[in-house]
């Protein structure tokens, strides 16, 4: 009998915290399957989900305000362990008969909590031991309200000077609340705390591993598709590349990929995609060379949003044209990942964090009547990368920096021209090449060059050069919601600038963007 990698599962209820997805990712890293649902998930759905444990996440609301969200009653009727984090602890306390009040002393940022209770959750977990034997944890706090009276049968787990009940526990029922955030890296022992809850208290086995996920996904694809044929829009990005590798392993020649080369890709990228998938892996890939069509449609357009729409529409037109030449296609594969699913599921609650979704294909002729196959829809981006490696994709492809869907079309400010794209491609290649040589590529989260349609005077030998300006952009970020500009060494910047100006005739000046997000965005357009 096949292994059920979803058998041991944790339910996470979202009350709107910016950290909720992080909780899910941490649980998955432990090797346990979990799902994230809005706080107002109905009781019957919770019972059907049949979790081994439930985590109530944080949120921006105040428990003692009217109409603030509450956990469904089924959470406390299932007789499974429950961990409340921040707001989750507060609503748990309130719903079970305790009290929550506002506080004049808010706690945001690093804090030390004293572990004052003997519970299974924190037994043997500490960062410090005082001379008098008090155990301490370095944690991350983000709260204004606090629990002032615990429900019956609960004991104090942890405290701070301004928050005497910074944690509470009822070992008999497996109920725990912590006012701090174990899911963020600033809480040093957070991983151990979550592992203790998920594995030791809830009894979940580590079934959710890269190799098991691949085997399970292959079995599911084969069961869904049978002997039918599948079409995939291959972009060369991480998601579509992993889908291609996974489907090829599952169904072989039943998969056909269409790779639209829009002329706005990185240097040699089109050839690299074809070499990897068609030549090395034997995947059926149709390459549509459509540079002229994209550039013709973009001619004269300088507005960033309009450029995006033109590129999107042109892609769909070309993909449709190629797809219509194929016979006997029943399924369309897409690289939908779990954050896209969370967004649509969370929309009804109004509390969930909204994520910009990504779809490889925006539309297909209705007469094709294709069914969707989405083998990555349960996975976070970091999990997609791990199974990419498991499937044998090269590390450099799987961990390549993000590249926008419209490609260089939004890294050329203003109107897009072939001359600009060719210059930008070469400059970007030099920048990335030097980052790799200096061992800075994987220290940055995203790095690229922006073409600016302005000219500047330069001197080359004894002559005057009047040529284009480009900007280097490199950032460090964890979640791409905020980012700081990367403090690259001056020597590295000097090398990159020198190479770009000396090797590319059309550039006379190189600048470095030192804007963080916010207020700036990572991409310029």
Curated annotation (Swiss-Prot):
Give start-end ranges for the coiled-coil region(s).
none
Q: Where is the active site?
A: 86 (nucleophile), 181, 183
Q: What class of enzyme is it?
A: ligase
Originating gene: guaA
Cite the GMPS ATP-PPase domain residue spans from the record.
Answer: 208-400
Pathways per UniProt: Purine metabolism; GMP biosynthesis; GMP from XMP (L-Gln route): step 1/1
Q: Name one Pfam family in it.
A: GATase
So where does ATP get bound? 235-241
Q: What lineage, starting at the top, does this entry show?
A: Bacteria, Pseudomonadati, Pseudomonadota, Gammaproteobacteria, Pseudomonadales
Instruction: Give the protein's function.
Output: Catalyzes the synthesis of GMP from XMP.
| Name listed for the protein in its UniProt record | GMP synthase [glutamine-hydrolyzing]
GO-annotated molecular function: ATP binding; GMP synthase activity
